[in-house]
Structures are given as structure tokens and as C-alpha cells.
């Protein structure tokens, strides 16, 4: 492992870390160690790293903002590639933009507000990066990535390929981004709007999100997808589960579709709590809730 880390270190400008606790990099503050943790500063470093990892047969996962993911307590036996270095962002005069996969969604929205570009303002306050937002077709209110996405640049061991939006097949919290590919950038299109109107709206959206979801404890956002014609939080509420806990994991008192780390929670606590919620909701309503959170790593 030290030899591989040294070889990766020759590629990267940032340090390669061994045994890095992933709890430091996830919004739940949960997760065991990564065998190797690396942070490419650009697409060239990323592709070179993927090529080397493929040569040695090392499994890997990408990690952006660390939201919408649960890392198991045993950590990840392989490489974790942090995409925070992919920060390029460029706009043209026609309201189109190319945005790096590591750019936080909120940072993009702020730039759009300054330029009077509308299309993602409903996502204000969403704790995600553009790369992760493309992979899961992140959405809020009446908007999602699919509404502004022209295409995405996907990196693999052999280089970067552009996929147009129709090939990405964005649906409700899903896309066709395949395993073994990382979103390095997204090509987006926006419509013109008043910067002043956008600024007011975005401020209101952030305030609304904080009021409705400001749980004050580590969490990963919404845990379950909304079933067709239903809202997951209402189904959970119908079972009177706010405050229900397993170990250090607890259904938020503020928002029923959030699970919070109330202190010392382990991934196993969260998984057991998810299973309990599913069982109780199915028993009461007949509906099986589908998790929105991706689970990675070993128990």
C-alpha cells in the first residue's frame, strides 16, 4: 500500500493519505478509514490516478461533499477519490456554463444570481457538489439538474468522455452515470432573470430550508426517496417516529426524513434505524420506502 501511495504521490500535488477516517469527510460524521485517500487538483491528475488504480486492480469510489452517502464502520478497502479539486467554472454570454464536478451547488447558485441566470435557485442551500448532483439528479422544489443539464464530462482510466443529457437518462434521483466514471464537469444552460429577484428568492429559499430542516446535528439530508404521489416524511410522521432512535442514530425531531447523529453514531446504527423505519411504514401504509442514501464500504 505504501508503494502505491508513493506512486500516486508522484502524480498528485496534494498528499496521499493512508488510513484516513472517512468520518472527517462525510456530513453524518460517520465512517471507518479509507485504505488510500487522494485529492486530485484537476482532471489530468484524476485520469492519471484512475489509470494507475486500474493497472493495480485497486477498487475506488468518488467522494464529493460527503452528503447522501453512508460509509460503513469498517471503512473502504480501496481508494477514496475526493473531487473537491475540480473547481473550474466558466460562463458564456448566452447563459451557458461549464462547471467543475467539485463545485458546491450553492457556490454555483451564487454566481448565477450575480449574472441573472435562473434554473437552479430552488436548490439553494443544498449541500452537494455538481458532480454528485448530476449522478443523483439532485432536485428541490420544482427544479432539478435535468432541467438545466446539456451534458457531462465523465472521467475513467482511459480519459474523459462527453455524455449528452439524453445519454445520461436523468430521472427521479437517478442517472445512467456508470460505475467506474467520475463527473469532472457539467455543461449547463440557464435562462435570463433579474439578479435582484433571484437574490431575494434564493435568500428566502435558504431561510425556508433552515427553518424546515435546520436540525443542528450531523445528517445526510433526506434519507428516503418520495414514493409516487407521496412524501416520505409524511409517511414516517404517520408512524410517529420523530425522535425514535437506534444507538446514536435518531429520526430528527425537526424533519422526519432526516436521520441525525446525536453523538457517537455508527453506520450500523443508521442502517438498523433505516430498516426499522421501513418496517414500520410498510406495516402501517403498505409502502416500502426506498433509501436515497448510498451505502459504501465494509461492515
UniProtKB/Swiss-Prot annotation:
What Gene Ontology molecular function terms does this protein carry?
FAD binding; UDP-N-acetylmuramate dehydrogenase activity
Q: Which Pfam families match?
A: FAD_binding_4, MurB_C
Q: What is its EC number?
A: 1.3.1.98
> Which key words tag this protein in UniProt?
Cell cycle, Cell division, Cell shape, Cell wall biogenesis/degradation, Cytoplasm, FAD, Flavoprotein, NADP, Oxidoreductase, Peptidoglycan synthesis
- Where does the record place it? Cytoplasm
Catalytic activity of the protein: UDP-N-acetyl-alpha-D-muramate + NADP(+) = UDP-N-acetyl-3-O-(1-carboxyvinyl)-alpha-D-glucosamine + NADPH + H(+)
State the active site: 173, 222, 292
Pathway assignment: Cell wall biogenesis; peptidoglycan biosynthesis
Instruction: Name the Gene Ontology biological process terms.
Output: cell division; cell wall organization; peptidoglycan biosynthetic process; regulation of cell shape
Coiled coil location: none
Q: Which residues are the signal sequence here?
A: none
**InterPro entries, from UniProt?**
FAD-bd_PCMH, FAD-bd_PCMH-like_sf, FAD-bd_PCMH_sub1, FAD-bd_PCMH_sub2, MurB, MurB_C, MurB_C_sf, Oxid_FAD_bind_N
The entry's cellular-component GO terms read: cytosol
Give the required cofactors.
FAD
Q: Which residues form the FAD-binding PCMH-type domain?
A: 29-193
Top EC class of this enzyme: oxidoreductase
**Which protein family is it in?**
Belongs to the MurB family.
Its annotated function is as follows:
Cell wall formation.
- Protein name, as recorded: UDP-N-acetylenolpyruvoylglucosamine reductase
